[in-house]
Amino acid sequence: MSLWQHIRRSALLLPLLLAACAGQGIQGASSERDIARVEAYFHTVDLKAAPFSQVWPDGAVGSGELAYHPGYLDMRFTAPHPMTLHAEGRHAVFTDSATGAETRIGLAHNPLGLLLDNPVHLGGAVTVTDIRHAPGVLQLSLARTDNPSQGLVTLRFRDSAARLALYEVRIVDERRRVTVITLGSG
């Protein structure tokens, strides 16, 4: 078998492997507690004018302020130039002020849509595929239960004194392109 055939076969099997892994989910009392804590965070979070930075898949960097509560996201970029992303429910609109372009995005098959349910529920249609702990950090990865190959969202929280604070969202789309959003001013 040639190298090209091996790569092609591997690429064809990848969605099946992702589906198998995501379908297993995370089990155990500790994992259930972590999931419940993250759900509780999303039930009460109400970010307003939170500074953020974003690294796009091509390495370009942007920054601005965002507002978020379950079912709603508004990102106002100030760098590299004024842009907005407004997402509510199942749709998002990206507006680039420099070009005047407006792009409408359906979120039913987009990883970002995992965070726009109201309330956010980490079960049923959403599968927690991985939970990791480091000192002062809780990390959860999420995928759509019915089609995990559509993308993955990894959430990183500061975990101090039993309180969670979201500080990073890493989104991997169906083409394995990575976008990283970091909350905070530095």
Residues covered by each model-derived region:
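Flexible, processing/modification-adjacent segments and terminal tails
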Residues: 36-52, 56-57, 95-152
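Short hydrophobic/aromatic-rich beta-strand segments that constitute the beta-sheet cores
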Residues: 52, 73-77, 92-95, 140-142, ...
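Short, solvent-exposed coil/turn segments at beta-strand boundaries
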Residues: 44-46, 67-73, 87-91, 157-166
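Gly/Pro-enriched, hydrophobic low-complexity segments
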Residues: 123-124, 130-186
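An acidic-aromatic
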Residues: 65-114
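Bacterial N-terminal signal peptides
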Residues: 10-20
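N-terminal leader/targeting segments and the immediate start of mature chains
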Residues: 21-63, 69-71
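Bacterial N-terminal signal peptides that target proteins for export
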Residues: 2-12
